[in-house]
């Protein structure tokens, strides 16, 4: 039912995933079924909030909205807001201190709902995409002073100091560890010292870090 509900709720959005991709996404984002909630009609999920749980802000236990959606024919009934209100006592009882979510800026309906619930915008993300055949890599023409080697996720734990920003929830080191073999990690070694790295999904082309 989870995949059917997700596919139906996002059928008119710029989101398209198959069952395998949804499973990988939920695993990577720390999906917790016991702390996720839905609205049902005739035993079918018509609206839902899938929550991921982890330590994000200053090590505090945080819930992350992995996906909130409502089937088109059930929109306009305030189901998302009712689900969120219903979930709060359960999340607090589980020790959740923060609730984090992301929303597309042009989704004015969702923005209005979240603002009415007391959410504040902390930062904005840019999202870039390109067809792989149109990506131009000028670096391949230059002599390399480093060697590229395959790494494991634990190999980059000490390299988090390389960041000049805080990655989003789904790109955070904890999400990378949860993803396991769904992601590939490559490191740039100079004199056997890690000088840079890249984490990506070979299936989707997503560059994680």
Regions found by a protein language model. Name each.
Residues 6, 12-42, 46-54, 162-185, ...:
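Active-site rim helix/loop that mediates acceptor-substrate recognition in acyltransferases
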Residues 38, 44-53, 62-64, 69, ...:
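Conserved beta-strand in the GNAT
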Residues 67-72, 76-90, 112-116:
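Conserved acetyl-CoA-binding loop-helix of GNAT-fold acetyltransferases
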């Amino acid at each position: 039912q989870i995949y059917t509900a997700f596919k139906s709720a996002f059928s008119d959005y710029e989101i398209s995933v198959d069952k395998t991709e949804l499973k990988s996404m939920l695993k990577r984002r720390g999906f917790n079924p016991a702390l996720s909630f839905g609205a049902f009609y005739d035993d079918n999920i018509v609206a839902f909030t899938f929550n991921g749980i982890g330590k994000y802000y200053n090590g505090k236990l945080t819930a992350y909205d992995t996906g909130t959606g409502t089937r088109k024919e059930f929109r306009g009934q305030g189901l998302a807001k009712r689900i969120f209100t219903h979930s709060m006592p359960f999340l607090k009882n589980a020790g959740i201190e923060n609730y984090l979510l992301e929303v597309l800026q042009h989704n004015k309906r969702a923005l209005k709902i979240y603002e009415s619930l007391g959410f504040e915008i902390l930062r904005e993300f840019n999202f870039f995409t390109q067809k792989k055949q149109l990506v131009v890599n000028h670096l391949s023409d230059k002599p390399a002073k480093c060697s590229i080697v395959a790494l494991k996720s634990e190999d980059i734990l000490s390299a988090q100091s390389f960041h000049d920003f805080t990655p989003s929830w789904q790109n955070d080191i904890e999400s990378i560890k949860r993803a396991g073999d769904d992601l590939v990690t490559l490191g740039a070694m100079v004199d056997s010292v890690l000088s840079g790295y890249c984490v990506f999904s070979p299936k989707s082309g997503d560059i994680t870090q």
